[in-house]
Amino acid sequence: RRSWAVGLLIISILTMACGGAASVDDYKAAFVYLGSPNDGGWTQAHDEGRQYLVEQTGIETAYTEDVPPDATEFRTVAEAYIEQGYNIIFGTTFGYLDIMEEMALEYPDVIFLHCSGYKSNDSNYTNYFGKIYEPRYLSGLAAGAITESNKIGYVAAFPIPEVIRGINAFATGVKEVNPDATVEVVWT
């Protein structure tokens, strides 16, 4: 079910990014993965979405796995795809955010789609993400219901909109079932 949702999200993004006049034959999509497609989590969900995209549209895709969140590494991989005619580049980790923004300016005919970021431009660079705040709300309900101390910790990575939405959803869930509980956020 998760791969279906990721695939549907990707198809929706491609439909919006590519417009209605172009054919699927006009596009080739490359995915740059932080991890392995069989990691049982983040990268696997993206790869299952990529496979679903191929099944549903027939678009040609490729991927490179285990690309660290390093600008030089990402650029090397993405430019190799661009040289091969790939005109849609998916970057699937937060660490690719800035280099994708930079490359979008350098390659205006290539669409750059970044997962979990917050930057975009008006032409060829945007981000995508699922409604992760919904399960965070449910987690907050559970935490608020089982706490004995009324003190709940939340570990967060970066103070960006996506993370703040998750914190707010979690805290809302906690307060829904336990108005006396407090949530303390610790940043890594």
Please report, for each region that a protein language model flagged, where it lies by residue.
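Short, well-structured alpha-helical segments in soluble
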Residues: 71-86
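Extracytoplasmic "Venus flytrap"
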Residues: 30-49, 53-56, 62-74, 94, ...
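Short, low-complexity disordered leader/linker segments with a strong preference
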Residues: 1-27
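Flexible loop/hinge segments that line or gate small-molecule binding clefts
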Residues: 105-130
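Periplasmic-binding protein-like
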Residues: 85-93, 113-115
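Short, well-ordered beta-strand elements
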Residues: 27-34, 60-62, 151-153, 182-183
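An alpha-beta-alpha
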Residues: 50, 136-185
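Short beta-strand elements in bilobed, periplasmic/extracellular small-molecule ligand-binding domains
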Residues: 56-66, 178-188
